[in-house]
């Protein structure tokens, strides 16, 4: 009944071949690449590998953590991560690879925790940002289209500096000022005031805040008339309204939720979940080959500061104090530094981003402090400037927005799509309500119902699941956390290992009913957001 299993050791691959018949996915980990080769030369797994029924992992690969994170983030796996367990294929592996197995198991548990945490089963943030995205559409259609920026500026210069607001930033500002004409500067909104005090004008300022606290960063927006202010499409509407100017660009994320509206002029980019991630992906989209990062500490400094001197909310920002802490390797391998789980999640996401784009650009970590970030070259900011920044950067005019006629037509099409989504949401709510009433009728009985009847009910639940899983509106990721919760509820039943089918289906129905109530509540919230458009 488990949808996947993790196994350490390929052995002679016969066990893997036989198990593959019973699982949707088998994840096989091996520390000796020669054993992979030997096993695959004995047993043909080509068909299983081709359709990802069997996935092989090299335990000594540098990017193993990233590979695991990618798999665990897949919706079909994410839902059932609470079932994770590392099985060992034979006593041989336990005898000779126990240390490797324990280390791998710890890594998998950590990756599963990050994936589950990111899924956000409360759906609070996805529902909030979905509503804000809908409110921002009219402003976005009047802003600079992202595709015009790409058409006019892509591959025109090689060197970029991404500025973050970590504690190490202050010591880099004098050098940044000296070289500001020789690099295109991407500035996280939180670092803006520090640059302003030094007379440094960034080329791009990025923002993706779901609250309006960031309005404080833009108090001197008149200094940014030649800068592009890049806002993520779901940033707080108050920020969008306060910055609604000819140099604003509101960008759509490269997610199904935003792509399904076909507003292609304004997308698409992986803005990530923190502002500097947005800066890096914007620099990559514009074709920069050398991306230098400063102020990217992702850790507290020795005085316990979370941000650089001059940060608008103080060097010890209260928002960072109550998050669970941990120690991680420090920049340049100099011991360890204190961070918290949110920064650490950001670091893992950045490492994934850098590893995936190492053929497009070279990433230089010139922070000279904070946490070590893998898949970057650690080099002092001075060395980066002297080595790379030898040419003046080009000057550009601000691109124009769309004509009013074109933006009005796009708005009409957008509203038509929203109308269809409303109808779809209402249909699913009605179906869910009918199903809820059936399940409550079954659960109200004080005796076990016949197995044949229960099997029909179980099949109806599977059919409803299938309709949910195949619908583009339902699967636009706003309710991703709700489906992670569905998986957890079902996994809790599977972990009971109920052998009797009647008792198993009854337990399944009880769990599904509890989830269905939760799902209806979240879908109702999404429906209300659509109704406000």
Regions found by a protein language model. Give the residues of each.
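Short, basic, glycine/proline-bearing loop/turn elements
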Residues: 2-4, 158-162, 202-204, 257-268, ...
């Amino acid at each position: 009944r488990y949808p996947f299993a993790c196994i350490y050791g390929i052995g002679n691959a016969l066990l893997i071949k036989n198990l593959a018949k019973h699982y949707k996915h088998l994840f096989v980990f091996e520390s000796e690449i020669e054993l992979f080769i030997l096993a695959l030369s004995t047993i043909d797994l080509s068909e299983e590998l081709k359709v990802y029924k069997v996935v092989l992992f090299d335990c000594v690969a540098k990017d193993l953590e990233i590979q695991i994170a990618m798999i665990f983030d897949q919706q079909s796996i994410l839902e059932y991560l609470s079932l994770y367990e590392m099985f060992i294929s034979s006593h041989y592996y336990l005898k000779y690879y126990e240390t490797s197995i324990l280390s791998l198991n710890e890594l998998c548990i950590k990756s599963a925790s990050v994936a589950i945490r990111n899924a956000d089963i409360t759906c609070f943030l996805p529902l909030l940002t979905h509503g804000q995205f809908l409110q921002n559409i009219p402003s976005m259609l009047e802003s600079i289209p992202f595709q015009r920026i790409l058409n006019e500026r892509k591959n025109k210069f090689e060197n970029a500096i991404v500025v973050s607001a970590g504690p190490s930033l202050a010591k880099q500002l004098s050098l940044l000022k000296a070289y500001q004409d020789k690099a295109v500067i991407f500035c996280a909104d939180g670092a803006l005031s520090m640059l302003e005090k030094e007379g440094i004008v960034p080329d791009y300022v990025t923002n993706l805040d779901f609250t309006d606290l960031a309005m404080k960063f833009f108090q001197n927006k008149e200094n940014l008339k030649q800068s592009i202010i890049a806002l993520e499409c779901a940033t707080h509407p108050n920020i969008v309204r306060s910055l609604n100017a000819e140099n604003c660009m509101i960008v759509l994320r490269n997610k199904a939720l935003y792509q399904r509206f076909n507003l292609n002029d304004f997308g698409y980019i992986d803005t990530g979940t923190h502002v500097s991630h947005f800066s890096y992906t914007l620099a990559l989209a514009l074709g920069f080959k050398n991306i230098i990062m400063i102020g990217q500490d992702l850790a507290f400094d020795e005085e316990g500061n979370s941000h650089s001197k001059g940060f608008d909310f103080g060097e010890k920002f209260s928002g960072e104090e109550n998050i669970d802490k941990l120690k991680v390797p420090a920049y340049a391998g100099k011991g360890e530094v204190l961070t918290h789980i949110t920064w650490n999640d950001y670091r893992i996401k950045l490492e994934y981003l850098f590893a995936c784009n190492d053929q497009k650009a070279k990433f230089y970590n010139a922070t000279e402090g904070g946490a070590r970030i893998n898949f970057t070259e650690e080099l002092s900011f001075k060395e980066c400037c002297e080595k790379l920044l030898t040419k003046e950067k080009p000057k550009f005019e601000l691109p124009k927005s769309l004509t009013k006629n074109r933006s009005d037509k796009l708005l009409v099409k957008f509203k038509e799509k929203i109308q269809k989504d409303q109808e779809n949401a209402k249909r699913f709510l009605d179906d869910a309500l009918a199903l809820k009433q059936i399940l409550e009728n079954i659960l109200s009985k004080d005796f076990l119902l016949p197995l044949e009847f229960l099997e029909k009910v179980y099949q109806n639940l599977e059919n409803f699941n299938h309709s949910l899983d195949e619908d583009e509106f339902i699967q636009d990721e706003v309710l991703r956390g709700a489906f992670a919760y569905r998986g957890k509820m079902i996994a809790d039943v599977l972990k009971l290992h109920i052998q009797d089918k009647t008792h198993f289906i009854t337990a399944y129905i009880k769990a599904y009913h509890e989830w269905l109530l939760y799902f209806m509540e979240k879908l109702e919230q999404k429906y209300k957001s659509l109704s406000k458009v």
